[in-house]
Amino acid sequence: MCLPGLETQGGDFEFEVEKVKTPTPSQTRRQGWGSHLSVFASPILQVFGVSLLCVGVAVSQVSKPTAKPPVEFSPPVPHTNAPLGLIPRMPGDGDGAYKTHHYRDLFAEQGHPPEESRAKIEKAFQRLFHGDGQEQRIYFETGANENGALAYITDWANNDARTEGMSYGMMIAVQLNKKREFDALWNWANTYMLITDPKDPSVGYFAWSMNTDGTPRSTGAAPDGEEYFVMSLYFAAHRWGNGQGIYNYKAEADKILRGMRHHPVLTGVGPFRIHHEDPPFVAPDHSWPSPNNKRREQEAAAKGEKLQAFHAPWDAPHSETIGPMVDEDHFMIKFVANQDINFTDASYHLPAFYELWARWGPEEDREFWAKAADVSRDMFLKVTGPETGLTPDRNYFDFTQIISRDGAPTPFSYDSWRSVSNWSVDYSWWHKAPQETMLSDRIQNFLYGQGIGTFVDRYTLDGKPLSDRHSVGMVATTAVGSLAATPGPISKAFVEELWKTPVPSGEQRYYDGMLYLMSLMHCSGNFRIIE
């Protein structure tokens, strides 16, 4: 989950995005997000049109005078989503890889032998999972418990472990038949991230951000992690069979998937705990120790300023109501499970996975996921920029834009990189939605025009650059777009660009590296439905 502007500089409740000196994705994505209390339910923050969901979380700021909204500014009217309306239904198995068992190898189509692709994937895996601990790997084993080895995937630059990365790591492991790594990650997630305290209304979900020692940075969940947990567990059940306890993969997948739709509506008063025996989680009075924050402290000191820890008013006791991760009326995954959230994140939408859940998941939920797949396909078409193919980081359930206090709609940002991969994999596996070809053509044509080796990683939906960084993760996911794009020079150029891109290393290797490795697997036909 990525909300732009969190680590920008400003006074109280001042979060503005500047093009100059753009923070890296790991600086901005998810840092400081906790239990995800809805901003739109907070009169204080609603005035500013900011999605600040940081219950009990310290957010780093540079100390500056408090900025006031202009006199003529008036708070936005709370949005009421329109009914879903008619959605084109796409029953049956389609004509994609699920039916044909054929997965395109885009690299082989351009003259790179399959054995070279497999070697490239294995090299990336070994570096990211077992390479040098300072510069290359993001997978770290931490001993064992009664369930076996324990390991986490870390966002190195922010020094935390996230359900997003844990579930991505599990998906990579099951696809590449790396059972030890899969089980160690799943064991760590269950041991430390699974919320078991019945007084936490997010009980049964996984806390989205943790310190790498297993202590919390949050006490709430982000649905993109749960989604990849579910899919990787079903694949593990089919690849390795079911074991006992937490290694009964199908039972665990069913349990999470049921919870995503049927989690009871619970209200609690925080601060909350992950486990009953834990102390209540209250954010520290300083920024979390990390390479990103250290750099920001140095930059602030050079200007004669001090990096301060900003605490939201919810550090005091607060009430929070949590329910399902889906909106029943709109058949959509929610941004977070808070009851008052009325918007989604396009990059959370995984119609290729939903089709499988409609076949493999709990019987009572299969029709829901079948329709959710069709809704996601329709949403991609309706929320993308008509000339650019860029998706917003967030939009309302009725496909309308979320407008900030300055009148600007939510832009294409770091989470958004994943959307093109999501609809293109859906096209590859199911071949049900021909409009996905048009969408891949649009985004590839736009970014090619920006410069295939120089396009930036944040834009307005109509194509105005909002950053100055060219990101490997975005190159990788856009290359996956070639699974759906019209074959031609542009789609081939993106595949070749990914082929010649080295494995990400250094401080920002987490998000770029995860997307890079999964994209190599998709583009080579090695990311498959495991039946």
What are these regions (language model features)?
Residues 58-60:
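Boundary at the C-terminal end of the N-terminal hydrophobic targeting segment
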Residues 179-221, 454-458:
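Helix-terminus loop motifs that line ligand-binding clefts
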Residues 159-169, 215-241:
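Aromatic-rich carbohydrate-recognition surfaces in CAZymes
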Residues 497-507:
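Solenoid-like repeat scaffolds
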Residues 169, 181-182, 246, 253, ...:
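Solenoid-repeat scaffolds in large eukaryotic assemblies
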Residues 78-123, 127-130, 134-137, 156-163, ...:
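Extended ligand-binding clefts on enzyme/binding-domain cores
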